A protein has these predicted regions:
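Major-groove DNA-recognition helix of helix-turn-helix-type DNA-binding domains
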Residues: 12, 39-63
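N-terminal intrinsically disordered, low-complexity, charged/polar
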Residues: 1-29
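A short, sequence-level motif marking secondary-structure junctions
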Residues: 20-21, 74, 101
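Short, well-ordered secondary-structure elements
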Residues: 53-98
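Conserved small/polar residues in nucleotide/adenosyl-binding loops
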Residues: 100-106
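Short capping/connector residues at structural and topological boundaries
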Residues: 12, 20, 42, 84-85
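Detector for short helical micro-motifs
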Residues: 30-31, 99
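Non-catalytic, well-ordered alpha-helical segments in soluble enzyme domains
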Residues: 32-37
Length: 106
């Protein structure tokens, strides 16, 4: 597995991300929770098309692995589009800045 990164934002919290074959995969539960879905797992099932499972280090025990649900960028935008929160647009701008510019402070 590639190294996990954590993208942090004061408004949206932390999003765990891995890079695989030059593309980012986002922790689906982190994204759905940041976008205000009351049931993040259900939101992933209903809106995401290309869900993948990857092993990641266990947060309390780095020697152990846990299986996590990751989504590609296209599914990230699907969750944004279906979110009913007004902050979804700000979330989209923040992620876009992280992925496509060097200034992610916006």
């Amino acid at each position: 597995m590639n190294q996990m990164e954590i993208f942090k934002n004061p408004e949206f919290g932390s999003i765990r991300v891995i890079e695989e074959n030059g593309k980012y995969l986002f922790c689906g539960t982190d994204v759905a929770a940041a976008l205000g879905y009351s049931n993040p797992r259900d939101a992933i099932i209903r809106h995401c098309r290309y869900v993948v499972k990857r092993d990641a280090p266990h947060p309390q025990s780095p020697d152990r692995k846990i299986s996590m649900t990751f989504i590609p960028e296209g599914d990230l935008y699907r969750l944004i589009v279906h979110s009913k929160l007004p902050s979804a647009e700000r979330f989209e701008r923040w992620v876009f800045c992280l992925l496509y510019t060097s200034d992610a402070a916006d």
